[in-house]
Amino acid sequence: MTKSIGLICGSLRKNSYNRIIAQSLTELDDSHQFRWIEINDLPLFNEDLEISVPETVTSFKSAIQDVDGIIIISPEYNSGIPGVLKNALDWASRPRESAVLSRKPVGLIGATPGGLGTAFAQLQIRQVLEAMQVHVLPFQKMLISQVHKKIDSEQKVLTDEQTKRYLQQYLHQFIHWIDHIPALD
């Protein structure tokens, strides 16, 4: 059955490696629908704004509700989660009784020119998501190191065939995970 997958890129940079990886997901699988969920225009989280929620936040939350699952594709900054992504997750967690990510299936992918493939950031993101009662794809980690050697930076496309295969396998596992989430609730 066709699934609707939301893609959240944890980088604001227009041509970020992670945005290129996210775009490649849409090209590697045409049997599912992919929807970009942008976090660029979200204001900094502030509980005072919950009285009159900004339209950008309302649209962001609605986009999350409208998909079957979310894949977060994020870089790692200073061995941690990018601030813009943490801000988006904070908005998605509030108010707690109607948190849009609660019980939603989420997968994590990260790409970096370094050698550890966003391992530290993914640990932190996973910790935040688990505190939000999100169903994070267990066991499967998609850590893409040396990403600058795996893409064509002029064409803005993933060229490494092994990484493409890994992404296809990861996506297959994620879709399978979505199908089994109801059994967990």
Tell where the protein language model's regions lie, with residue ranges:
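N-terminal beta1-alpha1 ligand-phosphate binding loop
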Residues: 2-31
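Secondary-structure boundary/capping motif
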Residues: 14-17, 45, 80-81, 117-118
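A generic structural motif
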Residues: 30-35, 134-135
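N-terminal beta-loop-helix "entrance" segment that forms/cooperates
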Residues: 39-56
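Glycine-rich phosphate/pyrophosphate-binding loop and the adjoining helix
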Residues: 135-185
